[in-house]
A protein has these predicted regions:
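Short, solvent-exposed loop/turn and secondary-structure capping segments
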Residues: 28-31, 76-79, 168-170
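A long, amphipathic alpha-helix that forms part
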Residues: 2-9, 23-64, 182
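Short, solvent-exposed loop/turn segments at secondary-structure junctions
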Residues: 22-25, 71-73, 161-164
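Beta-strand elements within well-structured catalytic alpha/beta cores of enzymes
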Residues: 13-21, 37-44, 48-51, 62-71, ...
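Secretory-pathway/luminal and periplasmic proteins that interact with or process carbohydrate-rich
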Residues: 25-27, 72-77, 131-133
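Acidic/histidine-rich catalytic neighborhood
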Residues: 61-64, 70-110
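Active-site neighborhoods of enzymes that stabilize oxyanions during catalysis
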Residues: 96-200
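Feature for exported/extracytoplasmic and membrane-associated proteins, marking the mature portion
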Residues: 1-14, 121-124
């Protein structure tokens, strides 16, 4: 990065980005209060300090922005917080494909004319579980700005934190031990999803 900034003005990039992936990786693996994450945060801080000192020494009119793409929340494999979707997926086979990432699940209809039928089936499956919400794409909360893109599922299944959807509890628990971290919940209801934004 410093070498780019030292280039002649005509060759110097006008916009440069960096991403420290090791902070996110540690948070996912061991949670937000782990010693591993603290060590990675310290490393990120040291690297950022080197960059900031280098920018200061260059004496160029450079604006620095420090941000994150999301926050993170601690999770456990506590019984009752894991929601199994295998029987729902089997029930919808032939009607829809389900792409599940834990916090939310995208349902893509094979026949758009079956939207209401499939929507009602999903609503019925989660009836009585107040921690799961089911939306038609066009009825998602406006504040999400998540209605118009063609890649968004026809129906969305959303969980409250710290509830988590998995196809098979056995397969999921085999890969999850102790505390781990995740993100993807609604930041309006889960403040841990908020990120930083500093500019100077």
């Amino acid at each position: 990065v410093m070498n780019w900034f030292r280039l002649p003005e005509a060759e110097r990039p006008r916009f440069v980005t960096l991403y420290f992936e090791f902070v996110d990786t540690a948070g996912h693996q061991t949670g937000t209060n782990s010693e591993k994450l603290k060590q990675e945060l310290q490393l990120a801080d040291e690297l950022l300090g080197q960059i900031m000192q280098g920018v200061e020494n260059l004496d160029l009119p450079i604006t620095t922005i420090i941000t994150a793409d999301h926050g993170m929340i601690d999770m456990t494999s506590e019984k009752g917080k894991i929601i199994i979707t295998e029987s729902l997926e089997n029930k919808l086979k032939g009607k829809a494909d389900m792409i599940n990432n834990g916090m939310h699940c995208q349902v893509y209809l094979k026949n758009k004319n079956q939207k209401e039928e499939v929507y009602q089936e999903i609503k019925q499956y989660f009836a009585g579980n107040s921690h799961v919400k089911v939306y038609k794409k066009e009825e998602t909360p406006e504040k999400w700005h998540y209605r118009n893109h063609e890649n968004i599922g026809d129906i969305l299944i959303i969980t409250d934190a710290p509830y988590y959807m998995v196809k098979s509890e056995k397969d999921f628990l085999a890969n999850r031990k102790g505390i781990w971290g995740t993100h993807g919940y609604d930041p309006h209801t889960t403040p841990e999803m908020m990120a930083i934004f500093y500019a100077f």
